[in-house]
Each structure stands twice: as structure tokens, then as C-alpha cells.
Amino acid sequence: MPKNIVVIGAGLGGLTSAALLAQKGHKVTVLEQGDWIGGKSRRIEVAGQVIDTGPSLFTFPGVWETFLAKYQELGGKLPKDLEFIRLAEVGRYFFRGDQIDIPVPESHQWHKPWQKFVAQHKALEGPITTLLTSAPLDLKALPALGKLLNVYGTRLSTNNYLNSLSWMPEGLKDLIAIHTLNAGVSPDQTLPIYASMTAIMSEQGISVPRGGMNEVPQLLAKLAEESGAEILLGQRVMSISKHAVKTQERSYSADVVVSSLDASLTDALISGKTAKMAPNRSCSGVAIYAALKNPLPAGTVTHSVVMPDDPADLYRALKSNSSPNQTMSFVNYYEPGHIYSNKKATVAVLLTAPADSADYDLKTPWVRDELDRVSNLIGLERPIDELFEDFKVLNANYFEGFGALGGALYGAKNPLWQSGPFHNPSYRSLTKPWLYRVGASVHPGGGIPAVMGGAMNSISSLI
Ligand SMILES: Cc1cc2nc3c(=O)[nH]c(=O)nc-3n(C[C@H](O)[C@H](O)[C@H](O)COP(=O)(O)OP(=O)(O)OC[C@H]3O[C@@H](n4cnc5c(N)ncnc54)[C@H](O)[C@@H]3O)c2cc1C
């Protein structure tokens, strides 16, 4: 029987759910508090140039393909799919005075161990995609789980697993381990699967849709609307109950509620109590988006990763929610006409930051120091912000405005045993069978593959 379904939030989690549920024939209304589609994946203009904020790299394309296949199975017609442009490298990493591209080139001393590592993880690409798109404890996922256990054995964290690889140089371990920050947590708090992700990304490559990342939520919204879903912007949900979702303006009756909000915010809207900041939280970011007066020097790659000299020190700072001495930064650089049809070059400098609600800007001492360090390491003669024509800074305070308290990008940080199939919260609870949870705070990992996979898993019984 078609149901009245209210989806809360028009980010990637909400839109993935809305497209599939509407295509299945349910009556779907999406309520979004902001005035844009995409949540953290937002499109802005800086000095007349189009820049997408939030996610910048598209990984694990098998999850996207699984979504499209499900949409078609339900009878949906696909418009032209996105054109994914594979970047020449996974990234150029700057670490302790060295500069290393991934995949590690033959000329680098780490080439052999890197090749060995990639070879050991090659067979896990399919199983990881299966696990990302399978409900917890789904029997069909057991063979995939078996393949992972064959590689990791009893090593339960990324750190434990990497430390067991006696043949691997310590620096290479650090470089692989830092990728757990893409899930907002340190490598002692994540499953070993995160180590494999680096190797798989190196094989599969990373990509960006032509036109930019915001093309992803735009296409999802189009599929949802073409399937009959109604997407209402500027509708802030004030309370959620078994039969109704209330905004400031009106009440929407609902047989089912799909919430893509941070789990703590969903709970607060149900209980009527004020949401509490989780003591242990995933990281936030200071994200600086700029249009440049002139392109960066020739040879600057699209995606650079500037590592801290002492990753352990950064993990400690993030755990105690204090400012780091040095952090891990992404520098995403687009030449004019690359990916976007911009006339000017643009850059995003994304500094990993504590989830402390702060309103940091370029004058904040640790941000200033990091910008200078990043500029120097990527080979600029002047601080990068001297090349900005105009810029915009998004920080923990901004992310808190529509997400988890503190600005934690992936919500609360759960104990290790809850970072797999037993994740907390679960997609559904026994006491509230009408509530389905999706979004970055639910499926471990929190990036686009986890959010889209998690949404498909959560609502599977409804489609
Ligand atoms: C700087 C940055 C870089 C990133 N880089 C990558 C990357 O390269 N690759 C990758 O895979 N992932 C990346 N991520 C993660 C990825 O962006 C997120 O995991 C994903 O976008 C989260 O989607 P979501 O639907 O869970 O949440 P959101 O996008 O936060 O959506 C939730 C929506 O709910 C709305 N909302 C909140 N409260 C209410 C309310 N009361 N009523 C109505 N609506 C409400 C919000 O406005 C928002 O639109 C990055 C994130 C950031 C911030």
C-alpha cells in the first residue's frame, strides 16, 4: 500500500531516499529548512565563479550504480547519467618534507610496498561495495564479510591492522591511516576496512562529475521530483511524532518519517527536549573556497593532501576538541574550464578542525599558520590567500547551523564495536517502527557512498 512519507532534509541521504520511495509509488514530501538542494553539498558563487562546497571527491562508484539500478528496477527512467571525470591521481601527499603521489610511482622508495598493499586489497573492491549497500547482518553479505576477514584476521582497528604489516614503512602506514579522517575519526577508532579504501581508491581512481559535485544532489532531486515527490525548501521541522511532522507553518501527516538529520537532532525533535552535544564527536572543518586572481603554478595537481608532521598529535587534538598544532588539509584546485566552466581558477583549502562550534577565520592563529604551511609545501612563493580575488569561509559554526552540534560532520563518535553492522543508532528502532534514519550520522563512514548506501539499506523494506 502506498504510504504518506515525510522525508526530512534535502541532503544526499534524504534525496536518495525520496527518489526511491517516490518511484516505488509512495506519496513523498521532502521538508528542507534551507533554501538550497544538497545540504552539505552546496553550490555557491565566489567572484562570479561556480564553486561546490562540502564533498569534492566521488568514490566507490559501485554504490551510485547500485542506486541507479534500484531506481530503474522500480520502473524509473534515467535521464542522461552524470559524466564522471577521473582525476589523474588519487592525490599528491605532502608529508615530512616528502612529496608522494598515490598511486605511488615507480621512482619512489615506497613503490614496492605500496604495490604489495594494493594487490592484497584488490579483491575487496566488490565486497566493500556489497557491504556498503547491504542491510546489517544481511545473509547475502556474508561472503563479502568473509573476504574481508581473510585479509584483516582478528585485527579490529585500522591502526592494529596496519601495525601488523611488518614489511610496510612506518611513513606509508601514517599516510594510509590518515584517510580515516575522511570519516571524521582517528585510525584507532575505525575498522581496518578504512585501510583498504585507500588501496581501492588508487585502483578505481577518484572522480568528480562534470559540472561539479552539486550535480549529484541536483540529479537526485530531479529523479525524486520526476517520480512524484514534492520537495519543499524553507521548511524547518520543529517536531516529529508518530503521525505528524510539524514545521513552523503547518503539520504534515505521515505514516512513515525518514529523517536524514543528525541522530541527536532527530531524537530532540521527537522528545521535545534540547539536543545535547555528544562528548565524543567526529571532526569538523574550516573550509576556505576562493576564486583566484591567477592560476596556481603549472603542475599543481587537482587534489593535494597536506599531512601534519605528527599525525598522532592531530588525533589527540581532535579527540579533546582542541585546536591542532598542525592538521590534515585538502587543497582542491580547478584550472579555468576544468570540471566547471569557470573563466577563473578556483581553489578550496579544507582544514580538518575540531567540532567545537567555533567561527574560525583566516586570522585565527592556527588557521593562519596552517595556510602558510600549506602554501609553502605546495610550492607557492606567497601565502595562498594573497592570490584570492574573493573567498568564503565555512567553519564548525556554519556546519552546526544545519547539522550536528559542535559542527561534527559525521555526528557522534561511537565505540569501535559500533562502527560496523551494529552501528548506533540503527536504521530503525523497535519502539518507533514508523521512523527510518538515514544520513551521515547513521551509516558508519559518513561519506557519500555510506550516505547513499545507508539510505538504500534503511528504507529497503519500503521499496
Ligand atoms: C567540507 C566537507 C568535505 C567533504 N568531502 C567529502 C568527499 O570528498 N567525499 C565524500 O564522499 N564525502 C565528503 N563529505 C561528506 C559528505 O558531504 C556528507 O557525508 C554528506 O553530504 C551528508 O549528507 P546527509 O544527507 O547525511 O546530510 P546533510 O547534507 O547535512 O543534509 C541534512 C539536511 O537536513 C536539513 N535540516 C537540518 N535540520 C532540519 C530541520 N529541522 N528541518 C528541515 N531540514 C533540516 C539540512 O539543512 C540539510 O540540508 C564532506 C563533507 C564536508 C562538510
List where the protein language model places each region.
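N-terminal glycine-rich phosphate/pyrophosphate-binding loop and immediately adjacent elements
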Residues: 3-123
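A conserved FAD-binding loop/helix module that cradles the flavin
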Residues: 55, 440-462
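General small-molecule cofactor/ligand-binding pocket signal
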Residues: 83-85, 230-234, 436
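Rossmann-like flavin
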Residues: 94-189
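A glycine-rich dinucleotide-binding beta-alpha-beta segment and adjacent secondary-structure elements
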Residues: 171-183, 380-444
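Helical element adjacent to the flavin cofactor pocket in flavoenzyme catalytic cores
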Residues: 196-239
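Mid-domain catalytic core of redox enzymes
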Residues: 238-342
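C-terminal segments that line or cap access tunnels to active or ligand-binding sites in enzymes
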Residues: 295-397
